[in-house]
Design a protein with these regions (language model features):
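Generic beta-strand/beta-sheet core signal
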Residues: 154, 183-187, 231-234, 241, ...
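Catalytic alpha/beta core of large soluble enzyme barrels
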Residues: 81, 341-350, 392-397, 484-646
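Acidic/polar, glycine-rich intrinsically disordered N-terminal extensions of enzymes
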Residues: 1-148, 299-303, 308, 612, ...
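Flexible, glycine/charged-enriched surface loops at secondary-structure junctions
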Residues: 118-122, 180-182, 221-228, 314-316, ...
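Internal maturation/activation junctions in enzymes
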Residues: 382-407, 411, 415, 430-489, ...
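Conserved, charged catalytic cores of large soluble enzymes
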Residues: 36, 48-116, 187, 191, ...
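Conserved small/polar residues in nucleotide/adenosyl-binding loops
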Residues: 680-689
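Function-dense linear segments that define catalytic or interfacial modules
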Residues: 96, 111-115, 123-147, 153-195, ...
Length: 691
């Protein structure tokens, strides 16, 4: 990465001076830069033209980080691996002023590499799209624009001071680019005694304040502040909490439309659902029963809210805690909450040393679509784990005083989350249907390969750098308490050539995506290859796919097997999605952002089966329930976390005719876009009989 006058972080042990390139005068660099940018249709910068720039056409130039002395040789020809959509995503959100794509990748690699060789390999992995750092690392690695971590978990204590402390911490976290998951289950419910002379107002008014604070605070310069709130299934206010994001019904002053929410589900509750038993709602303070309700009625309420609004997220807390790291079990550290995307499961609150913890996790993801390219590279995953270790250290060194509890937690457990993207893309590239034993076999093989590599890397790093304090305290040789977590990867999957996000199936084979620079038509690249082979890659075919809600099931020239391979997310039986998620659960230290997709005509038993089987088969958490409807419904905040597959599908009777227009024009006029899936009404959802 080529940067001039990069600000130094005075608190950091890692200095961030500019990268320099020799061999060109300022005027020559300006001319080369202008020529190269014009080749890809970009305007040259209008300011700071005397700042040296890397010319795309000058391959194999060495870029040196003058502070660390580390040198990275960049290859501008690798820009060709980026799609137009990926380029626009980088330009809209992640490039610094005057920075090229390869310079960005080199900036991150050189800053977090151990030495020249490690930095070079990291650059090669990123630029070849084998893996991609999480977006805060891309945005902020090697500069003072923000922190390289944006994932935080905390909890509110049952006192006014505890509540205000949480608000204050969340303001600072959001202001510095943090996404927050907060646990509110410690607070007494509405009407319980306070000091023997008063009654509590419950959790909702305090969550409402957090809702307003979240809306007011921006995350860096890239996105609005975001937060999720979590409550256990036995809290006395759970019934109102489930409906807190529903925009209609109830007191509008007791709604929190700008927050996301999740529910911690216990095994005992699910057994009560199985047995059609009663369920006690208990005071968090003294465990006295405040109310008793039928377990199934509460379960139905949860499912109804998920189908109609997409939330709450579900976290099966006993499964999560049973699989937490051994050192956390020995220390009595409990996992009570999750994050914005339900894949981070780390302990919060007061630890065994009497200190408060705000959990922190730094993320990056390998690209499974490129699995055949990196599977036999013995350095690949160990290099990434060293990279993540340096990222977490960067946060520890540079976290401001307002994040002391987060820095403490990061120092004690050093949890990271290496995830994946491109699973469905890999299946499709290799002609493998999602629904089948071949997909199950590859799913296990790939995740077992990753698990073995990260486990060995953690142990090897513990020998070299020392075990993390939480593990060392009990004689356990682990550099990281947690090593893996599967995030949604909405943005970085776009950067990686349009790989399918996370472990999620592709939602449509053609759709439009809006960016700050315009609207892009996105076609399934693997399907396009198949259509080319069959001589069917033309606008007429793509428009017919568009008219069929992104589906290829109507294409007579495809075989049944090919139609199975290119089923969309909503066409896949979700029980297969749960099955694959369950198979890899024990190979992932934390959890996985797992959406389920529900067609508008789904029967009630199918909806129940999906969610019930997730618990029964040992899945740790469920993210959104993406439901389809013919008519758009209100679902709350316009600032919802979105992925590129969150599409609004066209009305059944709204067919798009070509009329001489290009496919891009047709897609732009259609309603296939990146909006949220609409909600479908299941107001009278009833639970089927459980055998």
């Amino acid at each position: 990465m080529l940067m001039e006058n990069l600000e130094k972080n005075t608190k950091s042990k890692r200095k961030t001076p500019p990268l320099t390139i020799s061999g060109y005068t300022d005027s020559e660099m300006e001319q080369l830069y202008t020529q190269a940018k014009s080749k890809i249709g970009e305007k040259p910068p209008t300011e700071n033209l005397n700042e040296p720039k890397m010319d795309f056409k000058v391959a194999d130039r060495s870029v040196q980080h003058s502070g660390t002395g580390k040198t990275v040789k960049i290859d501008p020809s690798r820009d060709s691996l980026l799609t137009d959509f990926g380029r626009e995503t980088l330009e809209d959100r992640y490039l610094m002023k005057g920075e090229s794509f390869q310079e960005l990748f080199a900036r991150v690699a050189s800053y977090y590499g151990d030495d020249d060789e490690h930095s070079q390999r990291l650059y090669d992995y990123i630029s070849q799209l084998w893996f991609m750092p999480a977006t805060p690392i891309l945005s902020n690695g090697g500069n003072k624009r923000g922190l390289p971590i944006s994932c935080f978990l905390n909890e509110a204590n049952d006192s006014l001071d505890g509540i205000v402390d949480l608000w204050t911490e969340n303001v600072w976290l959001a202001a510095r680019g943090g996404g927050i998951g907060s646990y509110w289950g410690n607070l007494r419910s509405i009407g319980e005694s306070v000091g023997g002379v008063g009654k509590t107002s419950g959790i909702v008014p305090f969550i409402k304040v957090m809702d307003s604070l979240t809306l007011a605070i921006s995350q860096g310069s890239l996105r609005r502040g975001s937060a999720a709130v979590y409550l256990p299934i036995d809290h006395p206010e759970i019934e109102e909490f489930i409906e807190i994001r529903r925009p209609t019904g109830g007191d509008p002053n007791r709604k929190a439309l700008n927050l996301h929410h999740g529910v911690l589900i216990s095994d005992s509750f699910m057994r009560a659902v199985e047995e059609d038993g009663e369920w006690d709602l208990r005071s968090p303070k003294d465990q006295t029963v405040q109310k008793t309700i039928p377990a199934r009625s509460l379960w139905i309420r949860l499912l109804t809210a998920r189908v109609e609004t997409g939330e709450p997220y579900l976290v099966f807390k006993d499964r999560v805690n049973n699989l937490r790291p051994e050192q956390q079990k020995l220390a009595g550290l409990e996992i009570k909450t999750s994050n914005l995307c339900s894949e981070i499961t780390l302990p919060t609150g007061t630890d065994h040393h009497g200190k408060e913890r705000t959990a922190v996790c730094c993320l990056s993801s390998v690209n499974i679509e490129k699995y055949y390219e990196w599977e036999n590279d013995k350095n690949f995953i160990p290099d990434i784990m060293r990279f993540l270790d340096n990222v977490i250290q960067d946060f520890i060194d540079n976290a401001p005083e307002t994040m002391n509890t987060a820095a403490y937690s990061a120092m004690r457990e050093r949890s990271v989350g290496l995830g994946v993207m491109g699973l469905h893309s890999f299946f499709q590239a290799n002609n493998i249907p999602w629904e089948g034993v071949t997909a199950k076999s590859w799913n296990k093989k790939i995740f077992n390969h990753i698990k073995e590599a990260v486990d060995k890397s953690s142990q090897d790093l513990a020998e070299i750098k020392g075990a993390c304090p939480d593990a060392e305290e009990y004689g356990i040789k682990e550099r990281f308490s947690n090593k893996t977590a599967v995030a949604p990867t909405a943005s970085i999957s776009i950067i990686c050539g349009g790989a399918s996000p996370g472990i999620e199936p592709i939602a449509a084979n053609v759709y439009s995506h809006k960016t700050l620079s315009g609207t892009f038509t996105v076609r399934n690249a693997n399907l396009k290859k198949l259509l080319i082979e069959k001589g069917q890659d033309n606008d007429e075919v793509w428009i017919s796919i568009l008219n069929n809600r992104g589906s290829v099931q109507h294409l007579d020239f495809l075989t049944d097997h090919e139609k199975d391979v290119f089923k969309t997310a909503i066409e896949i039986d979700q029980r297969w999605l749960i099955d694959l998620a369950a198979d890899r659960t024990e190979m992932i230290d934390q959890a996985q952002s797992l959406n389920v997709f529900v067609p508008a005509d789904s029967d009630k038993k199918y909806i129940h089966d999906i969610h019930y089987s997730a618990w029964k088969k040992g899945v740790k958490s469920l993210y959104y329930c993406r439901s389809q409807s013919i008519q758009r419904a209100e679902t709350g905040s316009s600032d919802d976390v979105k992925s590129k597959e969150d599409i609004q599908l066209p009305d059944e009777d709204k067919k798009i005719e070509k009329k001489g227009k290009t496919l891009d024009e047709m897609v732009a006029e259609s309603s296939i876009n990146d909006d949220d899936y609409d909600a479908v009404s299941y107001t009278h959802l009833t639970l089927p009989t459980i055998a």
